[in-house]
Design a protein with these regions (language model features):
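Cytosolic-side transmembrane-helix boundaries in multi-pass membrane proteins
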Residues: 1-18, 168, 194-202, 274-330
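Short loop segments and helix-boundary regions at transmembrane helix junctions
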Residues: 1-2, 60, 80, 97-139, ...
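Hydrophobic core segments of alpha-helical transmembrane domains in multi-pass membrane transport
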Residues: 9-21, 50-51, 122-129, 162-173, ...
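Structural signal for alpha-helical transmembrane segments and their membrane-water exit/capping regions
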Residues: 14-29, 57, 129-137, 172-178
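Single transmembrane alpha-helix segments in multi-pass membrane proteins
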Residues: 15-23, 27-81, 105-112, 245, ...
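Helix-loop-helix "hairpin" substructures at the membrane interface of multi-pass membrane proteins
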Residues: 84-92, 98-103, 107, 154-229
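Transmembrane helix-bundle core of multi-pass membrane transporters
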Residues: 110, 114-177, 203-206, 225-234, ...
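Transmembrane alpha-helical segments in multi-pass inner-membrane proteins
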Residues: 215, 225-291
Length: 330
């Protein structure tokens, strides 16, 4: 049973690939289709990893999708106004960091709940995006260097390489470095973190800054793919991102959000949507599927967290019983 909960998403991913390959042998498991999935869904993975970071500390970033939206617009708009491509990229990343800082300060200093704070900042970003674009497409001549951001590295799509590198970095941070452990402690027990001298204000703010920059980077990659700015693009990445992060909490490290669980969840969602599309499913199936998966992911994540908590309580009780039963040596 433990193995099923740990590797369930991986098994599901393999089964989905096999099923869709059998149903569409000529089109599904082809280089073109695999490359298309990797390229298109790598942006989704970057957004999912951005919401994963504060979620470790039991905080939620609802501004991520709006951040992606305004970032992809600014990435082309600033270049259209004469800024070099690298300066535009740096400016967008700094904007993302500023959004994350604002979120962190609202949550840790003003004591606004993360749902409300990030929903508010996200709505502000949406309004600024609409004001900047005037509701129109933003067009500009993009240099080859910027377009190459979404090109290829060897035979792999560059966005997939970025997503893999970011995943590896976050895995190292959250599994092996004090910063990651502190954020997990803050998510599990803020009181215990306080007693151990862990500054909630500092680390939660840092988590939101990192999340904001990563969401902005996803917007930059997206703009390199689209090569046209649209104010309506970006928000649609939020729901699948939360679905992936929560669904990932049921696998690899059941009961807690984790990097590779999130990666597997994005892979499962991507393969399912691509497979259904090749089977001729209508356009509205994807949002129906994403919404259903979000509800399922929340339910499974809650159950996994409860099982993890029960195992911890049982282990503590067993340890206490062992200590009580120990013979007294006179």
């Amino acid at each position: 049973m433990r193995a099923i909960s740990v590797w369930g998403l991986l098994v599901l991913f393999v089964l989905l690939v096999i099923v869709f390959s059998l149903l569409r042998p000529d089109t599904f498991l082809t280089y073109f289709n695999i490359r298309s999935i990797l390229s298109n869904k790598s942006v989704q993975l970057l957004v999912a990893l951005s919401v994963f970071i504060p979620m470790v500390a039991n905080q939620f970033d609802l501004s991520a999708g709006y951040n992606v939206g305004i970032s992809q617009v600014l990435a082309i708009g600033l270049q259209g106004q004469g800024l070099p491509w690298w300066a535009a990229v740096c400016a967008v990343l700094l904007m993302g960091a500023a959004v994350g800082l604002a979120n962190g300060l609202l949550i840790t200093r003003v004591k606004i709940d993360s749902f409300i704070a990030t929903l508010g900042t996200g709505t502000i970003l949406y309004g600024l995006n609409a004001w900047y674009t005037g509701g129109q497409q933003v067009l500009a001549s993009l240099p080859p260097e910027f377009r190459a951001i979404s090109g290829s590295i060897w035979i792999a799509p560059a966005p997939a390489i970025y997503a893999l590198v970011v995943s590896l970095i976050l895995w190292v941070v959250f599994e092996f470095l004090p910063l990651g452990r502190y954020l997990y402690v803050l998510g599990a027990s803020p009181r215990a973190a306080e007693l151990n001298g862990i500054s909630a204000k500092r680390y939660i703010t840092f988590a939101f800054i990192a999340a904001g920059m990563l969401a902005s980077f996803a917007g930059i990659v997206l703009q390199s793919q689209l090569q046209v700015g649209q104010s309506s693009v970006g928000q649609e990445y939020l729901l699948p991102a939360f679905t992936a992060a929560l669904l990932g909490a049921t696998s690899i490290r059941p009961g807690r959000v984790n990097v590779w669980g999130t990666v597997l969840a994005v892979a499962v969602l991507a393969v399912t949507v691509a497979g259904l599309s090749q089977l001729g499913a209508p356009f509205f199936v994807e949002p129906l599927f994403n919404g259903s998966m979000l509800i399922l992911a929340v339910g499974l994540a809650v159950q996994a967290a409860q099982r993890r908590q029960r195992r911890g309580v049982l282990a503590e009780n067993a340890e206490a019983a062992g200590a009580t039963a120990a013979p007294v040596v006179e």
